[in-house]
């Protein structure tokens, strides 16, 4: 029987002052929270692995928790160092158009991360929603980002993560044609290893994700996973109904209300 893998999705790690310049604070996990996450994984007898290593059979699927990071925020360098220190790996999805700009990783940092065993993959050339683009534009995002990362780092780019989790109907076909082997989406659930390579589900860490809930993700508690999938289905319906701009306005309003 194929193992089911918990694939985690991070964005930024807040600094010691609890700040994450240039990142959406809603998705910025505290340093203490991230360290607690790593301890929870180790305590469960699991190891941190990149999706790339799992696909290349350099990690044991049955004993791994996959870690992924979207956007290439500068704080990801510290996260990579923590992961490398415990012998783990992770995938970091970056947009070449912002590499080296304020609050983002630069190419030397990405080279150091790759040398330490991290997997540097594509988040598109720009952080644009694919469902608002033509097929030719999506193809350009896939091809240009892959080429830029490979040219700068000298390592293969085989996995894509669509910005904002928005996908185009033909993404799988376009990604395969561009030389990718898998897509890590924002769909919520567990990954049945070896299946759904063009729609690998992930669980997103938020600033507000409690450690107890994280531990249930690691243990793959059925009720917890079901509730997250139900919430995702509801939010996906809202996105379809409101459109990207309407959904983002609603989301910002809800977040302001929650913090007031």
Map each language-model feature to its residues.
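Membrane-proximal basic amphipathic "stem/tether" segments
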Residues: 1, 17, 201-260
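Metal-dependent polysaccharide deacetylase catalytic core of the NodB/CE4 family, i.e.
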Residues: 3-17, 23-25, 62-65, 73, ...
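Short active-site-adjacent structural elements
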Residues: 16-18, 168-170, 184, 191-195, ...
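C-terminal domain-boundary segment and adjacent tail
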Residues: 26-60, 85, 150, 176-195, ...
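Short, acidic/polar
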Residues: 33, 76-77
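Short, acidic/turn-prone active-site loops that include or flank metal/cofactor-
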Residues: 94-99, 187-191, 205-206
């Amino acid at each position: 029987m194929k193992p089911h893998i918990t694939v985690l999705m991070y964005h930024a790690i807040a600094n010691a002052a609890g700040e994450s310049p240039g990142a959406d604070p809603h998705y910025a996990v505290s340093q203490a929270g991230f360290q607690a996450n790593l301890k929870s994984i180790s305590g469960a007898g699991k190891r941190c692995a990149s999706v790339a290593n799992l696909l290349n059979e350099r990690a044991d699927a049955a004993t791994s928790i996959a870690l992924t990071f979207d956007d290439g925020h500068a704080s990801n360098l510290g996260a990579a160092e923590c992961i490398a220190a415990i012998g783990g790996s992770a995938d970091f999805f970056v947009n070449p158009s912002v590499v080296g700009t304020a609050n983002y990783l630069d190419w030397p940092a990405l080279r150091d991360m790759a040398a330490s065993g991290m997997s540097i993959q594509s988040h598109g050339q720009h952080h644009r929603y694919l469902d608002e683009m033509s097929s030719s534009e999506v193809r350009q995002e896939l091809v240009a980002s892959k080429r830029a990362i490979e040219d700068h780092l000298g390592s293969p780019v085989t996995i894509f993560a669509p910005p904002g989790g928005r996908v185009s109907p033909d993404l799988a076909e376009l990604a395969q044609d561009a030389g990718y082997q898998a897509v890590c989406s924002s769909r919520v659930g567990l990954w049945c290893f070896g299946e759904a390579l063009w729609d690998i589900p992930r669980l997103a860490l938020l600033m507000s994700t409690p450690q107890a809930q994280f531990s249930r993700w690691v243990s793959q508690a059925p009720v917890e996973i079901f509730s997250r999938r139900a919430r995702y289905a509801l939010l996906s319906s809202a996105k379809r109904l409101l459109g990207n701009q309407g959904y983002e306005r609603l989301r910002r309003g809800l977040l302001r209300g929650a913090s007031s």
